[in-house]
Amino acid sequence: MGTSLLGGVPVAENVPLAPLTTLRVGPVARRLVTCVTTDQIVDAVMAAGPEALILAGGSNVVLAGDAADLTVVRLANTRISVDGDVVRAEAGAGWDDVVAASLAHGLGGLECLSGIPGSAGATPVQNVGAYGAEVADTIRRVRLLERGTGSVRWVSPEFLRFGYRTSVLKHSSQWVVLEVEFGLDAAGHSAPVRYRELATELAVEQGERTDPQRVRAAVLELRARKGMVLDAADHDTWSVGSFFTNPVVSRAEFERIAATVGSAVPNYPAEDGVKLAAGWLVEQAGFGKGYPGADAPARLSTKHALALTNRGTATTADVLALARTVRDGVKAAFGIELTPEPVLVGCSL
Protein backbone atom coordinates (compact mmCIF):
# COMPACT_ATOMS: atom_id res chain seq x y z
CA MET A 1 0.00 0.00 0.00
CA GLY A 2 1.51 3.34 -1.06
CA THR A 3 2.00 6.47 1.01
CA SER A 4 -1.00 8.79 0.92
CA LEU A 5 -0.49 12.25 -0.57
CA LEU A 6 -2.09 15.64 -0.09
CA GLY A 7 -1.44 18.10 -2.89
CA GLY A 8 1.32 15.77 -4.02
CA VAL A 9 3.05 15.87 -0.61
CA PRO A 10 3.40 12.75 1.59
CA VAL A 11 1.09 12.56 4.60
CA ALA A 12 2.06 11.38 8.08
CA GLU A 13 -0.84 10.09 10.18
CA ASN A 14 -1.65 10.41 13.89
CA VAL A 15 1.20 12.75 14.73
CA PRO A 16 1.42 14.38 18.22
CA LEU A 17 1.71 18.14 17.80
CA ALA A 18 3.00 18.98 21.28
CA PRO A 19 6.66 18.33 20.32
CA LEU A 20 6.24 20.73 17.40
CA THR A 21 5.41 23.67 19.68
CA THR A 22 7.59 25.50 22.20
CA LEU A 23 4.88 25.21 24.88
CA ARG A 24 4.77 21.45 24.23
CA VAL A 25 1.02 21.03 24.52
CA GLY A 26 -1.52 20.14 21.87
CA PRO A 27 -3.53 17.38 20.22
CA VAL A 28 -2.68 14.53 17.87
CA ALA A 29 -3.07 15.49 14.22
CA ARG A 30 -4.89 12.97 12.07
CA ARG A 31 -2.80 14.11 9.09
CA LEU A 32 0.43 16.10 9.00
CA VAL A 33 1.94 17.33 5.74
CA THR A 34 5.45 18.78 5.91
CA CYS A 35 6.23 21.08 2.98
CA VAL A 36 9.85 21.90 2.15
CA THR A 37 9.21 24.19 -0.83
CA THR A 38 6.90 27.14 -1.35
CA ASP A 39 5.18 25.37 -4.25
CA GLN A 40 4.46 22.40 -2.00
CA ILE A 41 2.89 24.72 0.56
CA VAL A 42 0.57 26.24 -2.01
CA ASP A 43 -0.49 22.83 -3.35
CA ALA A 44 -0.95 21.25 0.09
CA VAL A 45 -2.85 24.17 1.60
CA MET A 46 -5.26 24.33 -1.31
CA ALA A 47 -5.79 20.55 -1.25
CA ALA A 48 -6.26 20.46 2.52
CA GLY A 49 -9.12 22.93 2.54
CA PRO A 50 -10.04 25.88 4.76
CA GLU A 51 -10.11 23.95 8.05
CA ALA A 52 -6.47 22.86 7.90
CA LEU A 53 -4.12 24.30 10.51
CA ILE A 54 -0.97 26.02 9.26
CA LEU A 55 2.00 25.47 11.58
CA ALA A 56 5.64 26.51 11.35
CA GLY A 57 7.86 27.11 14.40
CA GLY A 58 5.00 26.61 16.86
CA SER A 59 6.41 29.29 19.16
CA ASN A 60 3.46 31.65 19.42
CA VAL A 61 0.47 29.34 19.43
CA VAL A 62 -1.62 27.52 22.02
CA LEU A 63 -3.34 24.48 20.52
CA ALA A 64 -6.50 22.97 22.00
CA GLY A 65 -5.70 19.58 23.43
CA ASP A 66 -8.93 17.97 22.26
CA ALA A 67 -8.98 18.97 18.58
CA ALA A 68 -10.21 16.00 16.55
CA ASP A 69 -9.78 15.05 12.89
CA LEU A 70 -7.15 17.74 12.44
CA THR A 71 -5.14 18.23 9.25
CA VAL A 72 -1.92 20.23 9.65
CA VAL A 73 0.24 21.76 6.94
CA ARG A 74 3.70 22.37 8.36
CA LEU A 75 5.87 25.02 6.72
CA ALA A 76 9.45 23.79 6.36
CA ASN A 77 10.67 25.93 3.46
CA THR A 78 13.83 27.41 4.96
CA ARG A 79 15.74 29.31 2.27
CA ILE A 80 17.33 32.65 3.25
CA SER A 81 18.87 34.88 0.58
CA VAL A 82 20.65 38.23 0.73
CA ASP A 83 20.82 40.74 -2.13
CA GLY A 84 22.47 44.02 -1.19
CA ASP A 85 20.54 45.42 1.75
CA VAL A 86 17.54 43.12 1.22
CA VAL A 87 17.10 39.84 3.10
CA ARG A 88 14.45 37.45 1.84
CA ALA A 89 13.37 34.55 4.06
CA GLU A 90 10.98 31.74 3.27
CA ALA A 91 8.25 31.24 5.85
CA GLY A 92 9.72 28.13 7.45
CA ALA A 93 13.18 29.60 8.02
CA GLY A 94 14.14 29.80 11.68
CA TRP A 95 13.80 33.41 12.76
CA ASP A 96 17.11 33.61 14.60
CA ASP A 97 18.79 32.12 11.52
CA VAL A 98 17.44 35.10 9.57
CA VAL A 99 18.87 37.53 12.12
CA ALA A 100 22.24 35.75 12.09
CA ALA A 101 22.36 35.72 8.28
CA SER A 102 21.67 39.44 8.09
CA LEU A 103 24.49 40.20 10.50
CA ALA A 104 26.86 37.84 8.70
CA HIS A 105 26.34 40.02 5.61
CA GLY A 106 27.04 43.22 7.55
CA LEU A 107 23.41 44.35 7.66
CA GLY A 108 21.92 46.06 10.70
CA GLY A 109 18.30 46.36 11.79
CA LEU A 110 17.21 42.96 13.12
CA GLU A 111 19.68 42.53 15.99
CA CYS A 112 17.25 43.56 18.75
CA LEU A 113 15.05 40.65 17.68
CA SER A 114 17.78 38.05 18.27
CA GLY A 115 16.90 34.84 20.07
CA ILE A 116 13.15 34.99 19.43
CA PRO A 117 12.00 31.43 18.73
CA GLY A 118 9.82 30.49 15.79
CA SER A 119 9.82 31.03 12.06
CA ALA A 120 10.24 33.98 9.73
CA GLY A 121 6.71 33.54 8.40
CA ALA A 122 5.18 34.15 11.82
CA THR A 123 6.89 37.50 12.31
CA PRO A 124 4.58 39.68 10.18
CA VAL A 125 1.48 37.94 11.54
CA GLN A 126 2.28 39.02 15.08
CA ASN A 127 4.43 42.03 14.22
CA VAL A 128 7.00 40.35 16.42
CA GLY A 129 8.99 42.72 18.56
CA ALA A 130 11.35 42.99 21.51
CA TYR A 131 13.72 45.47 23.13
CA GLY A 132 12.23 48.49 21.39
CA ALA A 133 12.15 47.04 17.86
CA GLU A 134 9.55 45.22 15.78
CA VAL A 135 9.55 43.64 12.33
CA ALA A 136 7.30 46.40 10.99
CA ASP A 137 10.39 48.64 11.21
CA THR A 138 12.15 46.72 8.44
CA ILE A 139 9.63 44.65 6.44
CA ARG A 140 9.52 45.72 2.78
CA ARG A 141 6.90 43.27 1.57
CA VAL A 142 5.36 39.87 2.31
CA ARG A 143 4.38 37.13 -0.13
CA LEU A 144 0.98 35.67 0.68
CA LEU A 145 -1.22 32.80 -0.45
CA GLU A 146 -4.93 33.64 -0.42
CA ARG A 147 -6.60 30.41 0.67
CA GLY A 148 -9.98 31.18 -0.83
CA THR A 149 -8.71 31.68 -4.37
CA GLY A 150 -5.25 30.13 -4.51
CA SER A 151 -3.74 33.39 -5.70
CA VAL A 152 -0.20 34.30 -4.62
CA ARG A 153 1.00 37.89 -4.41
CA TRP A 154 3.40 40.26 -2.71
CA VAL A 155 1.80 42.85 -0.42
CA SER A 156 3.11 46.05 1.16
CA PRO A 157 3.33 47.00 4.84
CA GLU A 158 0.32 49.26 4.26
CA PHE A 159 -1.78 46.22 3.34
CA LEU A 160 -0.63 44.42 6.50
CA ARG A 161 -1.82 47.22 8.82
CA PHE A 162 0.77 46.59 11.50
CA GLY A 163 -0.02 47.44 15.11
CA TYR A 164 1.39 46.53 18.50
CA ARG A 165 1.87 42.74 18.30
CA THR A 166 -0.74 42.46 15.56
CA SER A 167 -1.45 42.79 11.85
CA VAL A 168 -4.29 42.14 9.43
CA LEU A 169 -3.02 38.55 9.27
CA LYS A 170 -3.35 37.71 12.97
CA HIS A 171 -7.10 37.35 13.20
CA SER A 172 -7.80 35.84 9.79
CA SER A 173 -7.07 32.39 8.40
CA GLN A 174 -7.51 33.71 4.86
CA TRP A 175 -3.80 34.26 4.29
CA VAL A 176 -0.71 32.06 4.51
CA VAL A 177 2.70 33.74 4.62
CA LEU A 178 5.11 32.23 2.08
CA GLU A 179 8.07 34.64 2.16
CA VAL A 180 9.12 37.86 3.88
CA GLU A 181 11.50 40.58 2.66
CA PHE A 182 13.38 42.94 4.95
CA GLY A 183 15.17 46.15 4.01
CA LEU A 184 18.18 46.64 6.28
CA ASP A 185 21.06 49.04 6.95
CA ALA A 186 23.89 48.32 4.51
CA ALA A 187 26.24 50.59 6.46
CA GLY A 188 26.19 48.05 9.28
CA HIS A 189 24.62 50.28 11.92
CA SER A 190 22.25 48.82 14.47
CA ALA A 191 18.71 50.06 14.80
CA PRO A 192 18.44 52.84 17.42
CA VAL A 193 18.73 51.28 20.88
CA ARG A 194 15.41 52.48 22.28
CA TYR A 195 14.92 50.10 25.19
CA ARG A 196 16.30 51.37 28.48
CA GLU A 197 17.41 47.99 29.84
CA LEU A 198 19.28 47.19 26.62
CA ALA A 199 20.91 50.63 26.48
CA THR A 200 22.13 50.13 30.04
CA GLU A 201 23.50 46.69 29.19
CA LEU A 202 25.39 48.18 26.23
CA ALA A 203 26.47 51.34 28.09
CA VAL A 204 25.03 53.57 25.36
CA GLU A 205 22.44 56.35 25.35
CA GLN A 206 18.85 55.50 24.46
CA GLY A 207 18.33 56.14 20.76
CA GLU A 208 22.02 55.65 19.95
CA ARG A 209 23.17 53.28 17.20
CA THR A 210 26.08 50.91 17.77
CA ASP A 211 27.67 47.71 16.50
CA PRO A 212 24.78 45.32 15.73
CA GLN A 213 26.85 42.30 16.75
CA ARG A 214 27.26 43.83 20.22
CA VAL A 215 23.52 44.41 20.35
CA ARG A 216 22.81 40.81 19.38
CA ALA A 217 25.14 39.48 22.07
CA ALA A 218 23.54 41.71 24.70
CA VAL A 219 20.01 40.76 23.68
CA LEU A 220 20.82 37.05 23.79
CA GLU A 221 22.30 37.49 27.26
CA LEU A 222 19.25 39.40 28.52
CA ARG A 223 16.87 36.84 27.04
CA ALA A 224 18.80 33.94 28.56
CA ARG A 225 18.58 35.50 32.02
CA LYS A 226 14.80 35.62 31.62
CA GLY A 227 14.44 32.08 30.28
CA MET A 228 13.56 33.43 26.85
CA VAL A 229 16.09 31.42 24.83
CA LEU A 230 14.89 27.90 24.06
CA ASP A 231 16.60 25.13 26.01
CA ALA A 232 15.00 21.67 26.04
CA ALA A 233 16.54 20.98 29.46
CA ASP A 234 15.09 24.13 31.05
CA HIS A 235 11.34 24.09 31.70
CA ASP A 236 11.41 27.86 32.18
CA THR A 237 11.78 28.03 28.38
CA TRP A 238 8.84 25.70 27.63
CA SER A 239 6.55 28.60 26.85
CA VAL A 240 5.29 30.95 24.16
CA GLY A 241 7.44 33.73 25.56
CA SER A 242 5.43 36.60 27.01
CA PHE A 243 1.86 35.32 27.33
CA PHE A 244 0.23 38.75 27.61
CA THR A 245 0.86 41.96 25.70
CA ASN A 246 1.74 45.18 27.50
CA PRO A 247 -1.55 47.07 27.86
CA VAL A 248 -1.96 50.61 26.56
CA VAL A 249 -4.17 52.81 28.76
CA SER A 250 -5.27 56.42 28.71
CA ARG A 251 -3.31 59.03 30.62
CA ALA A 252 -6.20 59.32 33.10
CA GLU A 253 -6.22 55.55 33.63
CA PHE A 254 -2.47 55.56 34.19
CA GLU A 255 -2.75 58.32 36.79
CA ARG A 256 -5.53 56.39 38.55
CA ILE A 257 -3.35 53.27 38.76
CA ALA A 258 -0.32 55.26 39.92
CA ALA A 259 -2.39 56.86 42.68
CA THR A 260 -3.72 53.46 43.75
CA VAL A 261 -0.28 51.86 43.88
CA GLY A 262 1.39 54.79 45.56
CA SER A 263 4.74 54.07 43.93
CA ALA A 264 6.42 54.39 40.56
CA VAL A 265 4.61 52.48 37.81
CA PRO A 266 6.84 51.38 34.92
CA ASN A 267 5.47 52.99 31.77
CA TYR A 268 6.41 53.87 28.22
CA PRO A 269 4.98 56.37 25.73
CA ALA A 270 2.51 54.96 23.21
CA GLU A 271 0.61 56.49 20.30
CA ASP A 272 -2.77 56.06 21.97
CA GLY A 273 -1.81 56.68 25.58
CA VAL A 274 0.58 55.07 28.04
CA LYS A 275 1.99 51.56 27.75
CA LEU A 276 2.31 49.63 31.01
CA ALA A 277 4.58 46.67 31.73
CA ALA A 278 2.36 43.59 31.87
CA GLY A 279 4.97 41.65 33.84
CA TRP A 280 4.99 44.32 36.53
CA LEU A 281 1.18 44.26 36.73
CA VAL A 282 1.24 40.48 37.09
CA GLU A 283 3.73 40.57 39.96
CA GLN A 284 2.00 43.49 41.70
CA ALA A 285 -1.29 41.57 41.53
CA GLY A 286 0.29 38.82 43.61
CA PHE A 287 1.59 36.43 40.98
CA GLY A 288 5.32 36.22 41.54
CA LYS A 289 7.86 34.28 39.54
CA GLY A 290 7.21 30.54 39.89
CA TYR A 291 3.51 30.94 40.85
CA PRO A 292 1.69 28.79 41.99
CA GLY A 293 4.59 26.57 43.07
CA ALA A 294 6.95 23.76 42.19
CA ASP A 295 4.29 21.03 42.08
CA ALA A 296 2.08 22.76 39.51
CA PRO A 297 2.13 21.30 35.98
CA ALA A 298 1.92 24.84 34.58
CA ARG A 299 3.37 27.83 36.40
CA LEU A 300 4.95 31.19 35.82
CA SER A 301 8.60 31.04 34.88
CA THR A 302 10.98 31.32 37.80
CA LYS A 303 12.88 33.92 35.77
CA HIS A 304 10.12 36.02 34.19
CA ALA A 305 6.57 36.44 35.53
CA LEU A 306 5.07 37.08 32.09
CA ALA A 307 5.98 33.63 30.75
CA LEU A 308 3.53 30.79 31.46
CA THR A 309 5.50 27.56 31.36
CA ASN A 310 4.93 23.83 31.01
CA ARG A 311 6.87 22.03 33.72
CA GLY A 312 6.86 18.80 31.71
CA THR A 313 3.38 17.31 32.18
CA ALA A 314 1.04 20.26 31.57
CA THR A 315 -1.92 20.10 29.22
CA THR A 316 -3.52 22.92 27.29
CA ALA A 317 -6.21 23.05 29.99
CA ASP A 318 -3.55 23.55 32.68
CA VAL A 319 -1.95 26.43 30.80
CA LEU A 320 -5.28 28.13 30.11
CA ALA A 321 -6.40 27.76 33.73
CA LEU A 322 -3.23 29.52 34.89
CA ALA A 323 -3.68 32.22 32.27
CA ARG A 324 -7.25 32.86 33.42
CA THR A 325 -6.17 33.08 37.05
CA VAL A 326 -3.50 35.65 36.23
CA ARG A 327 -5.72 37.63 33.87
CA ASP A 328 -8.57 37.77 36.38
CA GLY A 329 -6.23 38.68 39.24
CA VAL A 330 -4.77 41.61 37.33
CA LYS A 331 -8.29 42.75 36.40
CA ALA A 332 -9.35 42.62 40.05
CA ALA A 333 -6.26 44.51 41.22
CA PHE A 334 -6.02 47.20 38.55
CA GLY A 335 -9.18 47.14 36.42
CA ILE A 336 -7.11 46.19 33.36
CA GLU A 337 -7.81 43.06 31.35
CA LEU A 338 -4.64 41.64 29.84
CA THR A 339 -4.75 40.40 26.25
CA PRO A 340 -3.06 37.13 25.31
CA GLU A 341 -0.19 37.50 22.86
CA PRO A 342 -0.14 33.99 21.31
CA VAL A 343 -2.73 32.79 18.82
CA LEU A 344 -5.23 30.48 20.53
CA VAL A 345 -6.36 27.68 18.21
CA GLY A 346 -9.54 25.83 19.14
CA CYS A 347 -9.48 27.25 22.66
CA SER A 348 -10.02 30.53 24.47
CA LEU A 349 -9.58 32.34 27.76
UniProtKB/Swiss-Prot annotation:
Q: Which family does it belong to?
A: Belongs to the MurB family.
Gene symbol here is murB
Q: Where is the active site?
A: 165, 242 (proton donor), 341
The record ties this protein, via InterPro entries, to: FAD-bd_PCMH (IPR016166), FAD-bd_PCMH-like_sf (IPR036318), FAD-bd_PCMH_sub1 (IPR016167), FAD-bd_PCMH_sub2 (IPR016169), MurB (IPR003170), MurB_C (IPR011601), MurB_C_sf (IPR036635), Oxid_FAD_bind_N (IPR006094)
Catalyses which reaction(s): UDP-N-acetyl-alpha-D-muramate + NADP(+) = UDP-N-acetyl-3-O-(1-carboxyvinyl)-alpha-D-glucosamine + NADPH + H(+)
List residues of the FAD-binding PCMH-type domain. Answer: 25-213
* Function comment: Cell wall formation.
Q: Which GO terms describe its biological process?
A: cell division; cell wall organization; peptidoglycan biosynthetic process; regulation of cell shape
Whether Endoplasmic reticulum counts among this entry's keywords is: no
A family per Pfam:
FAD_binding_4
Q: In which pathway does it act?
A: Cell wall biogenesis; peptidoglycan biosynthesis
Keyword RNA-binding annotated: no
Q: What is this enzyme's EC? A: 1.3.1.98
Top-level taxon in the UniProt lineage: Bacteria
Q: What is its main location?
A: cytoplasm
Q: Which cofactor does it need?
A: FAD
What is a single molecular function from GO for this protein?
FAD binding
Q: Where in the cell is it found?
A: Cytoplasm
A single Gene Ontology CC term: cytosol
Q: What organism does the UniProt record list as the source?
A: Mycolicibacterium gilvum (strain PYR-GCK)
Q: What is this protein called?
A: UDP-N-acetylenolpyruvoylglucosamine reductase
Keywords for the protein's UniProt record, in alphabetical order: Cell cycle, Cell division, Cell shape, Cell wall biogenesis/degradation, Cytoplasm, FAD, Flavoprotein, NADP, Oxidoreductase, Peptidoglycan synthesis
Q: Which PANTHER family is this protein grouped with?
A: UDP-N-ACETYLENOLPYRUVOYLGLUCOSAMINE REDUCTASE
